[in-house]
């Protein structure tokens, strides 16, 4: 009842509703995400068709949908009941598996029903890919008016063109609707909950908000921590990982990215890595204890021995 009472006095803040053009862009980007999920599901069905027919292409190929593996799949569909005895045409220079291992991986037999199912799946995947390409062209044309903001966002760590478009489509370009970056991070579901009762903390998990932007930011965070050109991000991730584990550390990096994006859009400034590298270095005036100095030297591979007794 108290919520209704404060709403009656116009004390409830309104929900974030982006402009119409941002909503249209958001609808297109989310549909692209759905097409990607459909393609992934079809890839899993292809893998299932091969596995139940005793074809173990994933044992010798890092990508079952690569050039060589796709050629073998096409060869299987030409005559599903015929054994493959020569794989020399399918082997590449970069392939680590031996000829015998490849022959063992293709030592299967596919029934007519599985072969027809596999043809339908591959045809559906081709149509999905064509639809996705057409949709991406439409997305790029729709997002062209936000090119300055997209270029700003892409200066941040681990964010490329479609990731930047996805972020803009979710949060918009006007950051005045969020009082602080903490409000934006809470809206995106990147802040821990504070569920406490009678002095007992029930849970500190992140919320379920941000069903679309949160996975996108996590993907960008994973790219950023692996890239060598962003040491400030990787150093922060490694420090958090030691104390809190990978999952909590990567969520913290995703929140860091969203905070960076908020400040870039609000101040109209590109990403400045120096603002985040300061925390990687200890203060110049800091004094190390003897134990700390010995520990640092030992970590660098030096052998520290005590001086001889006088």
Protein language model regions, located:
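A detector of single, family-specific signature residues
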Residues: 1-310
């Amino acid at each position: 009842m108290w919520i209704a009472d404060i709403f009656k006095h116009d004390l409830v803040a309104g929900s974030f509703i982006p402009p119409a053009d941002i909503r249209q862009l958001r609808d297109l980007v989310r549909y692209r995400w759905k097409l990607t999920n459909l393609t992934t599901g079809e890839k899993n069905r292809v893998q299932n068709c091969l596995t139940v027919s005793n074809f173990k292409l994933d044992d010798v190929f890092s990508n079952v949908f690569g050039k060589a593996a796709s050629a073998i799949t096409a060869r299987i569909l030409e005559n599903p009941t015929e054994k493959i005895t020569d794989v020399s045409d399918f082997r590449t220079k970069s392939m680590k598996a031996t000829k015998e291992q490849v022959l063992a991986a293709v030592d299967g037999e596919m029934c007519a029903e599985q072969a027809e199912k596999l043809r339908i799946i591959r045809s559906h995947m081709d149509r999905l890919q064509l639809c996705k390409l057409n949709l991406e062209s439409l997305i790029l044309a729709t997002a062209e008016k936000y090119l300055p903001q997209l270029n700003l966002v892409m200066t941040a760590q681990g964010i490329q063109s479609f990731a930047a478009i996805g972020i803009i489509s979710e949060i918009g370009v006007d950051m005045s609707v969020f009082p602080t970056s903490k409000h934006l991070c809470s809206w995106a579901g990147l802040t821990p909950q504070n569920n406490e009762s009678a002095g007992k903390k029930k849970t500190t998990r992140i919320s379920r908000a941000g069903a679309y932007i949160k996975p996108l930011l996590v993907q960008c965070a994973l790219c950023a921590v692996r890239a060598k050109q962003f040491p400030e991000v990787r150093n922060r991730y490694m420090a958090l990982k030691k104390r809190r584990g990978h999952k909590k550390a990567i969520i913290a990096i995703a929140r860091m990215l969203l905070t960076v994006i908020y400040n870039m859009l609000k101040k109209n400034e590109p990403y400045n890595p120096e603002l985040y590298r300061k925390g990687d270095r200890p203060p110049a005036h800091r004094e190390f204890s003897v134990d700390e100095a010995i520990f640092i030297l030992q970590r660098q591979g030096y052998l520290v021995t005590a001086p001889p007794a006088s």
